[in-house]
Amino acid sequence: MLEKFFKLSENHTDAKTEILAGITTFMTMAYILAVNPSIMAATGMDSGAVFTATALAAFIGTLLMAIFANYPFALAPGMGLNAYFAYTVVIGMGYTWQYALTAVFAEGIIFILLSLTNVREAIFNAIPMNLKSAVSVGIGLFIAFVGLQNAHIVVGGSTLLQLFSVDAYNKANGVEASFNNVGITVILALAGIIITGILVVKNIKGNILWGILITWALGIICQFAGLYVPNADLGFYSLLPDFSKGLSIPSLTPIFGKLQFKGIFSVDFIVILFAFLFVDLFDTIGTLVGVSAKADMLDEEGKLPHIKGALLADAVATTVGAILGTSTTTTFVESASGVSEGGRTGLTAVTTAILFGLSLFLSPIFLAIPSFATAPALVIVGLYMLSNVTNINFTDMSEAIPAYVCIIAMPFFYSISEGISMGVIAYVVLNLITGEAKEKKISALMYVLAILFILKYIFL
């Protein structure tokens, strides 16, 4: 049955590999179950309800990805988009969270229509192959940087970024943490990177997952030994699961279906909606390009088969997520961790979806996994994705320069979509001015995208 539905042999994989890949993807994404409620709670939303909405949106979206496209990609409320929702739209612009949810809902409906009419698929296929490889490399650097940041290995400083020290961390965050709070977690994260690296070199099956679990276990040992001292006020929580509230599922009632359609025809609403549309569109395309390139899923023309199903799953998940009460649900770049473990079909996604469903009942366990334990996974996955740099044609500067711009923009501007925007602009402008555009037969859609991106930077 699994073979027939997921075409395992055709995709050169087996059930064991797919399930392990799905578990790995979930473990690298589980942090969203803790982070999203924390961010959304800043708007006044009930954090328990947001946790339930987050888990359900991830469950439904990832399951739809498996059904519609048979791809090993997982979905959940996106980082960055949730921060824009909370800190810009609600806190910054002064709108209610219900109003912001309505914008997310409208975005989802528009994306469903765009997915059904092939607009999103056309955008995906219009991007040149060298630029697609660059997107994969850029995402690799981006998620490696996110991992280093989550582990506090790099912190803010006088040079913008610097290597960790307790003093630098305290100054950057305006707190008074000690070595037993933050210092030991940095050491554990570094140990985790080394351990995971050793497991990768030894080709141990499930190396990324084992790296997460071993790092977490070392943290628990340090907590028992008194080397790690939890301090909730500073964001350093106990590494032990907290079952004091039992296994009950937090109610969705406070946020379910709370859409506010009054004022949706205002200029502000259109601006908010466009921002959600833009970031989600190109973050999703960037993730699909990067992860599928790493998994060798692109065909000879650089196209991703069944992309319409993948984009439709993403759009429907966003719409459903808004009704449930969470920000934009999108394809997660952490899906690359499962792909690195050999995940190639929707069975990986189904496994991840099931674990998100189970997390509703076992939230204390999943919420106990600290960011320093998942950070090594992100760093190593970044290495895997960086390997696509060999597919970029560096002998042709008209191809190499746009690829370079795309790669460095993602980590430097902390945005996958910005990397794509700048890469597309650089590609079109450079090839147009140097007279290479006609020979390469750059698609009309690439010109349209470049113009739209330039207008975005001018007016937004």
Tell me what each language-model feature is.
Residues 1-49, 212-307, 451-454:
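Helix-loop-helix hairpins and the membrane-proximal interhelical loops
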Residues 2-36, 57, 78-87, 91-139, ...:
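Helix-loop-helix junctions within the multi-pass membrane cores of secondary transporters/permeases
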Residues 12, 16, 191, 270-274, ...:
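Alpha-helical membrane-protein architecture signal
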Residues 19, 39, 123, 206, ...:
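Residue-level signature of catalytic and energy-coupling elements of molecular machines
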Residues 23-30, 63, 67, 144, ...:
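Hydrophobic/aromatic residues within the transmembrane alpha-helices of Major Facilitator Superfamily
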Residues 44-63:
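Loop-to-helix transition at the N-terminal end of transmembrane alpha-helices
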Residues 58-79, 110:
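Juxtamembrane transmembrane-helix boundary signature
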Residues 93-214, 350-460:
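Membrane-embedded alpha-helical modules
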